[in-house]
Amino acid sequence: MNYLLGAFKPACNISITFSDGKNRKQVPMKKENGQTALVPLFHSQDTISGKVCIEPYQGKKVEHNGVKVELLGQIEMYFDRGNFYDFTSLVRELDVPGEIYERKTYPFEFPTVEMPYETYNGVNVRLRYVLKVTVTRGYAGSILEYQELVVRNYAPLPDINNSIKMEVGIEDCLHIEFEYNKSKYHLKDVILGKIYFLLVRIKMKNMDLEIRRRESTGAGANTHVETETLAKFELMDGTPVRGESIPVRLFLAPYDLTPTHRNINNKFSVKYYLNLVLVDEEDRRYFKQQEITLYRLKEDASS
């Protein structure tokens, strides 16, 4: 029985290393099992190069029908778990059919790779980039090894970045004017603004500003929308008086935000909203939601 079990054990160990692995930045990424691992960070147009090492276990040889390494960009919907939609697929053949008796190393390179989308792990969808090594075998089954990488892409400062101004209210009860300094914010930005009370005829308990993320997956009748409240910031406690102005100052850096994603490969979108919530003394809630655009600014760029 032990002999039979041993027959199905992998015959070799496969490792993947990057050429610039010692100097390349590593970022934390949450795995499917909930644990966090450090993963190398890349950007679109980077060259991805390194070595694949295949080492047979002692006393074993690896008969194979070829060795290849693939760079895959994939989208996985969690309602269709296990099925990946490839939007990037590059292949390098590393070896022709044969046998491996001892440690063998294969260099590989994918030059200036276009990686248009950022890595994203959401509620119902994930977008990932992965290196996949395949040692193709027949009856024994192919041997696979994966190495994930994180992709983040920077955007320039927007040429036009209008402020957001709106008047909202309940007829003859409440009339407010709110203003945010911009409509587009980078991930380390500060939201500045003010809430101005033009008319107050109801007793207010408090007022909060929320950051909400709305993830849409699928299309048409099969669209599924998931909304998360990522931050809640109290602006006011108690009832304001007519003419009162409440300042808004909300730092984005402490929160787990991503850039806005619009219709990624016709599979999903991620949008962000500022949600103004007013609660009166009878616990009735009044909302006003406004979409904002988030983008990733290079860390040495200034706003």
From Swiss-Prot:
Presence of keyword Membrane: yes
Entry annotated with the keyword Lipoprotein: no
A GO cellular component entry from the record: endosome membrane
Protein's membrane topology: Peripheral membrane protein
Keyword entries, A-Z: Cytoplasm, Endosome, Golgi apparatus, Membrane, Protein transport, Transport
Subcellular location as annotated: Cytoplasm; Endosome membrane; Prevacuolar compartment membrane; Golgi apparatus, trans-Golgi network membrane
Family matches, as Pfam families: Vps26
Disulphide bonds in the chain: none
Any one of the GO BP annotations: intracellular protein transport
Family, similarity comment: Belongs to the VPS26 family.
Described function: Plays a role in vesicular protein sorting. Component of the membrane-associated retromer complex which is essential in endosome-to-Golgi retrograde transport. The VPS29-VPS26-VPS35 subcomplex may be involved in recycling of specific cargos from endosome to the plasma membrane.
Assembly and oligomerization: Component of the retromer complex which consists of VPS29 (MAG1), VPS26 (VPS26A or VPS26B), VPS35 (VPS35A or VPS35B or VPS35C), VPS5/17 (SNX1 or SNX2A or SNX2B). Component of a retromer subcomplex consisting of VPS29 (MAG1), VPS26 (VPS26A or VPS26B), VPS35 (VPS35A or VPS35B or VPS35C).
Protein name, per record: Vacuolar protein sorting-associated protein 26B
